[in-house]
Amino acid sequence: MPSLCIIALFGTLTFYTLIPSIHTLKCVICDSPMGNYDCKTTYPAATECPGSSNNYCYKRETFASNGNLDQIRRNCNPVAASSKACKDLENGAKICEYSCNTDGCNSVAGMEPTRAVYFIAILMLTFYTFIRL
């Protein structure tokens, strides 16, 4: 009987881990040098993205030709950034774009665990539990 409960628990946790939750993506939205935040070290809390742009959060860094960071923009975006993160412009400047799709992932501390990490942890816990039985 305990193993049946464990299987039911594992199935429920797997379902909630693998099925995307139905909620609006929350991203940090700021634009430097405009506004109250510099968008590099200070930025507002993540807010819900509008329905038309709620697929990805992004961060864009613009560097001058001398290599200095000119602008940081964090926002919501309907499409992911290209696979090549940085591109050089003709005038020697460079633009780097990054996208992600978890709440607040475009913040400075945006390293949030993905669903795969949760799934692996649940799988390991279940495996350990079965071995102990």
From Swiss-Prot:
Tissue expr: Expressed by the venom gland.
Molecular function as annotated in GO: toxin activity
Secreted found in the keyword field: yes
PTM annotation: Contains 5 disulfide bonds.
Keywords: Disulfide bond, Secreted, Signal, Toxin
UniProt cross-references to InterPro entries, sorted A to Z: Snake_toxin-like_sf
Top-rank taxon: Eukaryota
Gene Ontology CC: one annotated term: extracellular region
Signal sequence, renumbered to the chain: 1-24
Main location: secreted
Pfam families: UPAR_LY6_2
Compartmental location: Secreted
Membership in a protein family: Belongs to the scoloptoxin-05 family.
Additional remarks: The scoloptoxin-05 family has remarkable similarities with the three-finger toxin family commonly found in snakes.
Protein name, UniProt field: U-scoloptoxin(05)-Sa1a
